[in-house]
């Protein structure tokens, strides 16, 4: 075997680094410099909160040493290229501690200035109240809603596990990094953290390390008010390696524990006993959690620590020490670049696949391979067929469902299950854990290299709404697949029948909602989702069979690419325009036939995606919905909430503004008036009687 020189250098570098990390006594800093940097982070955070007259000083005072240790001794990263792909990831799930994170970023050489810290929580600053992905260099995820970051961390660790096993080859560990997440008491009270932790243990995500800022305090008081379970035993039962550090401020012990965790074959949960508002008169009380302490207490605390009263004081010694990480990070990335260059030369096809995935260059070659559907079928079934064609062209597309894979048709039949022992499987079984599924999908998207999708019934989108909203806020390319989209699902009744969900989802900024009308429109819904790289897409599908529209009679399904299109027109200027979505397009087409027979010129517009339609040029929008045609109707088996924007205040909306009933879907459509005859009659009654 011929070993390249650069390989030898890389091997030696990492072996030496490994020795240093497993022999802490060779790698230790003085306690003096540790304390100096930690206190700098603490008091920068306090000063940020005081200047903003808003924020959370308690966590930075109590937990800055944890963040310091990770960035100083544990993690590999490049402050000047925080997007280096093989970096370790750190997630502050307890996003209210953001001041601490920004202060650490400043100290360790990320692209933040002291002026940025002074602009904490101010309009258009780089230091918002809670971390926002894409806004602040170094922030890995958008956090604030407690529990979300924990689930994101699980998703990141899953992405690393899949990608490393898919792409790495012997001697070329091009994907090899850890995910660290700092969680609060509140994070662990949230149900989503339990859901996500259960999956992490099941999948044996050994490169996931969660650190609990165990300070015993919530806003309402001591955690004993509401929380008396044994959290450590809970995590142990979930399959985690568990440690508790009663001496939570012993840096060497914490470092030693993290290094042990890195050798485990399971995810690790480290409980660190801390004190909120450490060192202040308000220590261990809720009063120090979420508001400025005030000048008097700040000065008293600084004096106690022997700290200058000057605001935003940064000792030169501390800054010089932490800024060494800039050169260290640069060297780490350069070494990796050398390794990757060799990998690229030896495995060009794999490298090209990885690079396309990282750049979100998802193949669209599958479009022409999807069959033209002739038979009538549920759109969920068509979606499953489309997915299984797509999967051959997008090797890092990973999907799953919340225990509904056969119902929502999310299974990639040739590609196996993602499990602890089969990490290159592409079907994730989330169990009945919708919220965790949403946060994990987001985590995969944050990580990069994965095209994630997840499915459940539309009604259960409610269980994952915080994750959907965060995906939209963070501009993540995540695809949510929701079937059983109306009363058309039938006998399961109103507990399962969506009514308010369509407009509820459409109300989320930056979320696109696509509801195809038949099987042949489904592939274009997926195309929209793949092309949309700066935000999430929800694809809405039927349980019930819908007719496959005769495209020799009606417009091509390609019109979906513009969000809305004229699927059926009339001669000359229309008297009335009927707008419909999904399965109700069939109803609108039937109503058109009745109205035309009565001499009423009718246009039918298929509004598959309102958000995409709004992106079109004004000229196109006026062509589809001529301003001079004011007799407009919207037909959708859900709430009428947003349709008046399109039909006008004098328009007609045929909708469902009450909960459904348990009965066959076809019976319910007739009962609630979603029939061609009823729509036609309503139009005639309003304008032509």
Swiss-Prot record:
Cofactor: Mg(2+); Ca(2+); Mn(2+); Co(2+)
Tagged with keyword Metal-binding: yes
Sites where the protein binds Mg(2+): 185, 215, 217
Gene3D superfamilies given in the database record: 3.40.50.920, 3.40.50.970
Keyword annotations: Calcium, Magnesium, Metal-binding, Thiamine pyrophosphate, Transferase
UniProt GO BP: pentose-phosphate shunt
GO CC entries: cytosol
Pfam families: Transket_pyr (PF02779), Transketolase_C_1 (PF22613), Transketolase_N (PF00456)
Name used for this protein in its record: Transketolase
This protein's encoding gene: tkt
């Amino acid at each position: 075997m011929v070993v390249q020189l650069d390989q030898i250098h890389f091997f030696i570098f990492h072996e030496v680094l490994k020795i240093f990390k497993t022999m802490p006594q060779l790698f230790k800093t003085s306690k003096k410099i540790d304390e100096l940097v930690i206190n700098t982070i603490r008091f920068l955070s306090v000063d940020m909160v005081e200047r903003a007259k808003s924020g959370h000083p308690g966590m930075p005072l109590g937990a800055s040493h944890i963040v310091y240790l990770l960035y100083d001794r544990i993690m590999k990263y490049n402050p000047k290229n925080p997007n280096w792909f093989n970096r370790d990831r750190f997630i502050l799930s307890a996003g209210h501690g953001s001041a601490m994170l920004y202060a650490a970023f400043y100290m360790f050489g990320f692209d933040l200035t002291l002026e940025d810290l002074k602009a904490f929580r101010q309009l258009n600053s780089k230091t918002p109240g809670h971390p926002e992905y894409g806004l602040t260099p170094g922030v890995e995820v958008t956090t604030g809603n407690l529990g979300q970051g924990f689930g994101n961390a699980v998703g990141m660790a899953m992405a690393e596990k899949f990608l490393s096993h898919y792409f790495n080859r012997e001697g070329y560990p091009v994907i090899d990094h850890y995910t660290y997440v700092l969680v609060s008491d509140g994070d662990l009270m949230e149900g989503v953290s339990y859901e996500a932790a259960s999956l992490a243990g099941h999948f044996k995500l050994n490169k996931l390390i969660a650190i609990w800022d165990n300070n015993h305090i919530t806003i309402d008081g001591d955690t004993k008010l509401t929380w008396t379970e044994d959290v450590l035993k809970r995590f142990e039962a979930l399959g985690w390696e568990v440690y508790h550090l009663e001496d939570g401020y012993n840096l060497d012990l914490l470092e030693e524990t993290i290094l042990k965790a890195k050798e485990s074959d399971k995810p690790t949960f480290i409980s660190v006993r801390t004190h909120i508002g450490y060192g202040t008169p308000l220590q261990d009380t809720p009063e120090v959690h979420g508001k400025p302490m005030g000048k008097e207490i700040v000065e008293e605390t600084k004096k106690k620590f022997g700290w200058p009263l000057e605001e935003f004081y940064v000792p030169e010694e501390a800054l010089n020490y932490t800024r060494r990480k800039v050169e260290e990070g640069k060297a780490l990335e350069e070494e990796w670049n050398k390794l990757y260059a060799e990998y690229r030369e030896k495995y060009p096809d794999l490298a090209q696949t990885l690079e396309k995935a990282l750049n979100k260059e998802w193949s669209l070659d599958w479009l022409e391979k999807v069959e033209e559907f002739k038979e009538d079928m549920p759109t969920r079934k068509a979606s499953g067929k489309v997915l299984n064609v797509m999967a051959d062209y997008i090797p890092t597309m990973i999907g799953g469902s919340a225990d509904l894979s056969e119902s929502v048709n999310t299974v990639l039949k040739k590609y196996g299950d993602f499990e602890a022992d089969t990490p290159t499987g592409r079907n994730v079984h989330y169990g009945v854990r919708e919220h965790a599924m949403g946060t994990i999908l987001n985590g995969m998207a944050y990580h990069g290299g994965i095209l994630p999708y997840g499915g459940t019934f539309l009604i259960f989108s409610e269980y994952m709404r915080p994750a959907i909203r965060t995906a939209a806020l963070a501009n993540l390319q995540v695809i949510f697949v929701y079937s059983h989209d109306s009363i058309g699902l039938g006998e399961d009744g109103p507990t399962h029948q969506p009514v308010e969900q369509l407009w509820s989802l459409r109300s989320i900024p930056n979320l696109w909602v696509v509801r195809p009308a038949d099987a042949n429109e489904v592939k274009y819904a997926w195309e929209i989702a793949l092309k949309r790289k700066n935000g999430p897409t929800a694809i809405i599908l039927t349980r019930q069979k819908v007719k496959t529209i005769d495209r020799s009679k009606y417009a091509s399904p390609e019109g979906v690419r513009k969000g809305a299109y004229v699927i059926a027109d009339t001669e000359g200027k229309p008297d009335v325009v009927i707008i419909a979505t999904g399965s109700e397009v069939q109803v609108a087409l039937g109503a058109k036939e009745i109205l035309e027979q009565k001499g009423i010129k009718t246009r039918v517009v298929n509004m598959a995606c309102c958000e995409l339609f709004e992106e079109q040029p004004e000229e196109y929008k006026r062509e589809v919905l001529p301003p001079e045609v004011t007799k407009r109707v919207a037909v959708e088996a859900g709430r009428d909430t947003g349709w008046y924007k399109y039909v006008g205040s004098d328009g007609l909306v045929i909708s469902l503004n009450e909960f459904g009933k348990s009965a066959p879907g076809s019976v319910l459509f007739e009962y609630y008036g979603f029939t061609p005859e009823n729509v036609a009659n309503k139009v005639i009654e309003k304008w032509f009687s």
